[in-house]
From Swiss-Prot:
Region (Disordered): 115-136
GO molecular function: RNA binding; structural constituent of ribosome
Family named by the database record: Belongs to the universal ribosomal protein uS9 family.
Name this protein carries in UniProt: Small ribosomal subunit protein uS9
UniProt feature, compositional bias: Basic residues: 117-136
Key words of the record: Ribonucleoprotein, Ribosomal protein
Provenance organism: Mycoplasmopsis pulmonis (strain UAB CTIP)
Signal sequence bounds: none
């Protein structure tokens, strides 16, 4: 699905959130260089699974290696941060071309995953786990 587009500005921004992570993504015309918090993505995310997850919007829109990605991400763990980066990239791609919306929406890349860890309640071991109850 090769969509032709005219770049309106040099940088395209997107904000993504997942669990307690917030990612600010900037896409620049380039060769596919991926940096997270001024470090190389492989060095930061460590696992190829997280990197593949974060770059999924590029696979769907067939725009691999056409943009340099600069990300500032805070909070949460690596899985949450990868999910936040994925949403940020998808939103930044929409700024480039609105034609990507149908492809990204169909793959649920534009939907914020609102699931957040439930808090621990007093008197319980975890959020819902209680001690074993004996009736007699």
């Amino acid at each position: 699905m090769a969509i032709s587009y005219q770049l309106k500005s040099p940088a395209f921004r997107g904000l993504g959130r997942r669990k307690s992570s917030v990612a600010r993504v900037i896409l620049l015309k380039g060769s596919g260089k991926f940096t997270i918090n001024k470090r190389e993505a492989k060095e930061y995310l460590k696992s190829d699974i997280y990197i593949k997850d974060a770059l999924q919007p590029f696979d769907l829109t067939q725009t691999n290696n056409t943009f340099d990605i600069r990300v500032t991400v805070r909070g949460g763990g690596l899985a949450g941060q990868a999910g936040a980066i994925r949403l940020g990239i998808a939103r930044a791609l929409l700024e480039i071309s609105a034609d990507y919306r149908s492809v990204l929406k169909e793959a649920k890349m534009l939907t914020r995953n609102t699931k957040v860890k439930e808090r621990k309640k007093p008197g319980l071991r975890k959020a819902r786990k209680a001690r074993q109850f004996s009736k007699r």
